[in-house]
């Protein structure tokens, strides 16, 4: 991704999974399974790390813009 390109994506997060990974359906929607529990922002931090690795950007470029306490989130990748 270039430094000026921004992308907002809808994501469904499933905390307390046995394995952390990202699934993409045919429509391009992401379902992200994280091992961390949804306590104290742990699942959100793991989500940010997984997405940064998936999109090959730094963690600072991944931002939760909606749904910080929900399983359904809108994420911005800068």
Name these PLM-found stretches.
Residues 24, 36-37, 63:
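Short glycine- and Lys/Arg-enriched binding-loop motifs that mark or flank ligand-binding interfaces
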Residues 18, 22, 39-41, 72-77:
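A periodicity- and composition-biased signal for non-globular, repetitive helical segments
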Residues 27, 39-40, 66:
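Short glycine-rich loop/turn motifs that provide flexible caps or phosphate-binding loops at active sites
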Residues 7, 48-78:
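C-terminal structural segments of small proteins and small subunits
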Residues 12, 16, 31-35, 59, ...:
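Basic side chains
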Residues 14-17, 32-55:
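Compact, glycine-rich, soluble single-domain proteins
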Residues 1-31:
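N-terminal first-folded block
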